[in-house]
């Protein structure tokens, strides 16, 4: 399915063309339905699919977001594409790619040279180009599930991952926008998260943790979502029958619900299995605002309670009440 569309002038002819970032979990990563598409506008609102190969299609990319910026300052719009997940491998980090435009709608993948730290950055849900350090070029901010808020500073077209404190806010982030919310001339961030109205809770002291491994040795990865208790151990969110549906050998370990009811992740799998598992955490679920104080510093504020009732998948900023402030 089309996850995100973007209208931008791909071929520098003065009209808006259309890029569609496509993805989904229904198909193998080798199915062409996952391929992104670029449609050229003839100037009269008629769109024709580009015959040029898009770099993301040759690497079986499961796209989640597309953003445009003139990265190399040559007058045309270049692209960032984020990878939502790797098919059949939930939890395994995806990558972002930087595509430079030749001015005619032909794109080249320059990620390995211009932004190598985008490789395996995480399960990307959204991104934004914004001049967050106020140095007159657009930086790249990337968010996702089990990810921090990752700022890539633009240094003459090369993107360097910052050591910003925002990278420590590990969430199920879904959307991001920027605006000057306090009128100090610096761009701040508002970021949509899972919210606080569900059975899930997370903090730095008691994070949610996802373990990913082929626990039942059947050549398929098994993601197991857990929460931390006061005793320091992690316990599965899923019930016994759900886990057995995923991993049949657990039926012998836990023959009934009584034997399973107090089982921690350490009771389910060996220490070697857990040590060799991919482990990623979430420590914040609130949709939040980060006020830019300059020099890479931000003040954190939760959005009001009504903004926490559900996951925030999209954000739109506008001065609705005409008071000079962004709502």
Summary of predicted features, one role per range:
Residues 121-184, 188-190:
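A compositional/structural signature marking long, glycine- and acidic/polar-rich segments
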Residues 27, 87-89, 148-150, 196-199, ...:
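Flexible loop/turn segments at secondary-structure boundaries
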Residues 18-22, 79-83, 139-144, 189-193, ...:
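Hydrophobic beta-strand segments that make up the repeating blades of beta-propeller
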Residues 301-311, 318, 322, 327:
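Secondary-structure-rich domain cores
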Residues 28-34, 88-94, 144-147, 201-206, ...:
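Short, solvent-exposed loop/turn segments at conserved positions within beta-propeller repeat blades
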Residues 1, 37-61, 93, 97-122, ...:
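Blade-edge motifs of beta-propeller repeat domains
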Residues 1-12, 16, 40, 62-73, ...:
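Beta-propeller blade termini
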Residues 146, 173, 186, 205-207, ...:
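Active-site lining segments that contact anionic ligands and/or coordinate catalytic metals
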């Amino acid at each position: 399915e089309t996850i995100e569309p973007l209208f931008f002038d791909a071929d520098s002819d003065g009209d808006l063309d259309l890029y569609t970032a496509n993805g989904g979990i229904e198909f193998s990563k080798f199915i062409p339905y996952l391929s992104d598409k670029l449609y050229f506008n003839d100037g009269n609102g008629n769109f024709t699919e580009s015959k040029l190969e898009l770099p993301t299609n040759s690497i079986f990319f499961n796209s989640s977001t597309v953003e445009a910026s003139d990265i190399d300052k040559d007058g045309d719009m270049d692209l960032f594409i984020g990878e939502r997940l790797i098919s059949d491998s939930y939890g395994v980090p995806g990558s972002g790619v930087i595509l430079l435009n030749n001015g005619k709608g032909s794109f080249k993948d320059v990620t390995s040279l211009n932004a190598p730290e985008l490789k395996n950055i995480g399960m990307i849900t959204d991104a934004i180009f914004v001049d967050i350090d106020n140095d007159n070029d657009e930086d790249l901010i990337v968010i996702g599930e089990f990810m921090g808020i990752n700022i890539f500073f633009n240094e003459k077209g090369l993107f360097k991952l910052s050591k910003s404190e925002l990278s420590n806010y590990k969430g199920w982030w879904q959307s991001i926008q920027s605006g000057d919310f306090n009128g100090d001339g610096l761009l701040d961030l508002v970021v949509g998260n899972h919210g606080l109205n569900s059975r899930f809770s997370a903090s730095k002291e008691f994070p949610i943790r996802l373990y990913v491994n082929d626990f039942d040795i059947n050549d398929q990865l098994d993601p197991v979502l857990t929460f931390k208790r006061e005793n320091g151990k992690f316990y599965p969110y899923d019930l016994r029958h759900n886990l057995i549906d995923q991993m049949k050998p657990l039926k012998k370990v836990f023959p009934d619900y009584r034997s399973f009811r107090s089982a921690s992740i350490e009771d389910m799998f060996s220490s070697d299995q857990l040590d060799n598992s991919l482990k990623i955490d979430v420590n914040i679920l609130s949709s939040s605002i980060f006020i830019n104080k300059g020099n890479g510093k931000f003040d954190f504020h939760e959005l009001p309670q009504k903004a926490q009732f559900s996951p925030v998948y999209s954000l739109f900023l506008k001065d609705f009440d005409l008071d000079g402030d962004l709502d």
